[in-house]
Regions:
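Short, extreme N-terminal segment that most often corresponds to the first beta-strand
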Residues: 1-13
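Short linear proline/tyrosine/threonine-rich motifs used for host-factor recruitment
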Residues: 6, 42-44, 54, 89-93
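Generic structural motif
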Residues: 9-11, 49, 59, 94
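DNA replication sliding-clamp ring fold and its partner-interaction surfaces
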Residues: 14-17, 65
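Short amphipathic alpha-helix segments
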Residues: 16-26
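Acidic, low-complexity, intrinsically disordered interaction modules
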Residues: 24-81
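Short, compact, well-ordered microdomains
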Residues: 83-86
Length: 94
C-alpha cells in the first residue's frame, strides 16, 4: 500500500498533518518518530527534534496512519506527495 487517505478531526488538523510530515518544495520527509498514540491523537517527532500532536477523526484512523507511516520512520520509504481536501489528507509514499 503506497497511498492512504487519513481523516482528521477538522481542516486545521489536516493542514497541520500534511505540513508536519512532508515539505513539498524540497520533497523532504520530516517525520522521524511516532512518540505516542493516545486514542485518536498522534504525537510525532520531527527532524528538528520538536514534537507535535495531530488529532485524527477516530482511533481507527490513528492505527491506519501508524501502520502506513512505519516504513517511512524506518527509512524504507519516503513521503512523495500529500494532498489536502477539507479534513482529509491523501499521503503517497515511494
Amino acid at each position: 500500500m503506497n497511498q492512504i487517505t487519513i481523516f482528521c478531526q477538522d481542516k486545521y488538523e489536516a493542514q497541520k498533518l500534511a505540513a508536519l510530515i512532508f515539505v513539498k518544495e524540497s520533497v523532504e520527509t520530516c517525520i522521524t518518530e511516532i512518540l505516542n498514540v493516545i486514542e485518536n491523537e498522534i504525537v510525532l517527532s520531527l527532524k528538528d527534534k520538536s514534537a507535535h500532536s495531530v488529532i485524527l477523526k477516530d482511533n481507527n484512523q490513528a492505527v491506519n496512519f501508524v501502520d502506513f507511516i512505519q516504513s517511512v520512520v524506518e527509512k524504507k520509504h519516503k513521503i512523495t506527495d500529500t494532498q489536502i481536501i477539507d479534513n482529509v489528507v491523501k499521503i503517497t509514499k515511494g
